[in-house]
């Protein structure tokens, strides 16, 4: 029996769980108030606070850290790497502590896991961080050599659901072609070809369909005009793209349940905006089907919005079901995804990857691509 501790720090919470093989023994979501987090100037300053919570969770459950077989966390904002399970190493910790790719609470998970590993000798892993990059070079070309398309998406849930579909069909993930749409506060739509995400919208930086809180792809000239209008600061413009865009901008809420309630009460404007979001999601699914040359085994809808089966899921399904059968996997169980990934490594079913080596290889390939684009 393998005992696994999962560590999943989010912006306003820390989710911790204990698994014994596939069975979840305990899970707890610790919410953090603005007052609690407000005393920390930087994300990294929260490290001791979050680590203490994890230690207390383990102690109160009656286990010692040395009784675990593995510690596993979300990957933070690392350098781009292919998908998979990675052994936490010194370069990874250095990258996360530097914040060179951005500061996010998810950066803390691997650092905490590494501390526990250093104390006990138990291995620490991260799984499919948001920076997973398996894009083909043709997908990186943006339309101008000074700008490159980036792969930033919900890699953990996307890969987990894709592998679950393959398992259901008695196939390997590496044998299937899928279009997977993760629909939550951010929306990522990816083309999975034979085990690799060869194209995906950048779910964070203003690319793809609009979402409950993000604007998605916008008309560029209008955006440039607004940037130089003198009416908004740099930070205000960024907030319009991520945070105050999408449903928030149109309807004043990011809660799909509230939007559905308004639609049922006869709010035609809410219905029009919500239908437009479904339209854009469907359009991006069509784009990814084209990336796969129409050879799509299944279209998969997942994430929190996939629970909304009165309007959103039917509207999307009606537009894309001609491409391939549509499967719906509501929500995203990141804790289970982390634990099962670590379990595959512990059982010898999957080899952990080396972050230092894989990030170096990715950089060499990317530099070669840039040489071709910029020459």
Curated annotation (Swiss-Prot):
The keyword Transit peptide does not apply. It comes from Thermotoga maritima (strain ATCC 43589 / DSM 3109 / JCM 10099 / NBRC 100826 / MSB8). GO terms for biological process: acetate metabolic process. This is Probable butyrate kinase 2. Belongs to the acetokinase family. It is found in: Cytoplasm. Its EC number is 2.7.2.7. GO terms for molecular function: acetate kinase activity; ATP binding; butyrate kinase activity. It is an enzyme of class 2 (transferase). InterPro entries: Aliphatic_acid_kin_short-chain, Aliphatic_acid_kinase_CS, ATPase_NBD, Butyrate_kin. One of its GO terms (cellular component) is cytoplasm. The gene is buk2. It catalyses: butanoate + ATP = butanoyl phosphate + ADP. Keywords: ATP-binding, Cytoplasm, Kinase, Nucleotide-binding, Transferase.
């Amino acid at each position: 029996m393998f005992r696994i501790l999962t560590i999943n720090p989010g912006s306003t919470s820390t989710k911790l769980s204990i698994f014994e093989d596939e069975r979840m023994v305990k899970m707890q979501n610790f919410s953090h108030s603005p007052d609690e987090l407000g005393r920390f100037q930087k994300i990294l300053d929260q490290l001791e606070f979050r680590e203490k919570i994890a230690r207390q969770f383990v102690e109160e459950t009656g286990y010692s850290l040395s009784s675990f077989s593995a510690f596993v966390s979300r990957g933070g904002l690392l350098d781009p790497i292919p998908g998979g399970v990675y052994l936490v190493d010194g370069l990874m910790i250095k990258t996360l502590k530097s914040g060179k790719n951005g500061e996010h609470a998810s950066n803390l998970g691997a650092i905490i896991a590494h501390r526990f590993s250093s104390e006990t000798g138990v291995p620490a892993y991260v799984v499919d961080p948001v920076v997973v990059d398996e894009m083909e070079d043709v997908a990186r070309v943006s339309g101008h050599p000074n700008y490159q398309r980036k792969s930033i998406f919900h890699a953990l849930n996307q890969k987990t659901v894709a592998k679950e579909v393959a398992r259901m069909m008695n196939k390997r993930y590496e044998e299937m072609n899928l279009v997977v749409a993760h629909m939550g506060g951010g929306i990522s739509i990816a083309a999975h070809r034979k085990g690799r995400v060869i194209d995906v919208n950048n779910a964070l930086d203003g690319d793809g369909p609009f979402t409950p809180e993000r604007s998605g792809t916008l008309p560029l000239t209008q955006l440039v005009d607004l940037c130089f209008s003198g009416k908004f600061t740099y930070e205000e413009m960024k907030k319009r793209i991520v945070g105050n865009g999408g449903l928030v901008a149109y309807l004043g809420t990011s809660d799909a349940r509230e939007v559905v309630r308004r639609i049922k009460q006869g709010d035609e404007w809410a219905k029009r905006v919500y239908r437009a979001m479904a339209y854009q999601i469907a359009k991006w699914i069509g784009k990814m089907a084209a990336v796969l040359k129409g050879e799509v085994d299944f279209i998969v809808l997942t994430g929190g919005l996939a629970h909304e089966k009165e309007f959103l899921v039917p509207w999307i399904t009606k537009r894309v079901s001609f491409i391939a059968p549509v499967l719906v996997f509501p929500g995203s169980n990141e804790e289970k995804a982390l634990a099962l990934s670590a379990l595959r490594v512990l059982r010898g079913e999957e080899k952990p990857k080396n972050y230092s080596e894989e990030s170096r290889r990715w950089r060499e390939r990317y530099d070669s691509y840039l040489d071709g684009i910029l020459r």
